[in-house]
Amino acid sequence: MKNDSRLRKYVPSLLLFLLFEAVAVTLWLMKDNLFYLLNFSYIGGCLALGTALFAAGKRYARHFAQLAVGSYMLLYLGVISRENMQIEGFWYYLFLGTFEAATIHYAVAKIFGPLLFGRGWCGYACWTAMVLDFLPYKRPQKPRREKLGVLRYVMFALSLALVSGLFLMKVAHLEQIMFWLFLAGNALYYLAGIALAFAFKDNRAFCKYLCPVAVFLKPMSYFSLLRVHCDESKCVHCGKCLRDCPMDVEVNREARKRKNGTECILCYECTKVCPTKALH
């Protein structure tokens, strides 16, 4: 029985790996391009290993996954391969009517994938959060400012308007422009993210208030299969889970599992600090 219980905690990691392998093989066969097999196998393998190490109690397991996947996507896919994997890249390929690069990435990680793993992208693979999570305010020092969340929708609309405008004006050398937008956009994200972290004393302030990608992630995350649950019979309402949650999710009420679950990044910091093991 003990062995079964120990193995059960690795099931999500196995399912994650199998999902990415299914995507890898499907795209490889559909597009007759070995890159898709290697790309999604690498990403899925890193995420599965990172989550498995976390389940085994390894302290820096999530940071391993963040660095392995985030650095690969930022430096290799973005800088070396010159693919704009930001939200502007998604609009670009979508307007071209091409199911490539950013459109595939968004479909898998940010539009349909959240049905399984919610906003796990934000916790384990985002190259912006990869840097922000190393800043000094792991625990938010101030309450979340709910009204500022509207800014992410403004950013979302601006990114759509920018790429739409470039297409409507039929700007020349648009592919090259998208590469420079990728570099400039990431620089602005890092600058804004670091500035907000110190201003609000919260590493994840950018994720809560400005990141436009959350607009894609939140709807499907509402139905996520993977989520943190609270056994209210064990909960002593000590508040440690909320104090340690980087996203200010009120996880200690079972009623929150749908609404507030759209902000949960599955970092499981709450489960580590729960004194009665009420969270799982």
Stretch-by-stretch model annotation:
Residues 1-252, 262, 272, 277-280:
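Non-ligating segments of multi-cofactor redox enzymes
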Residues 254-267:
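Short linker/helix segments within small regulatory modules
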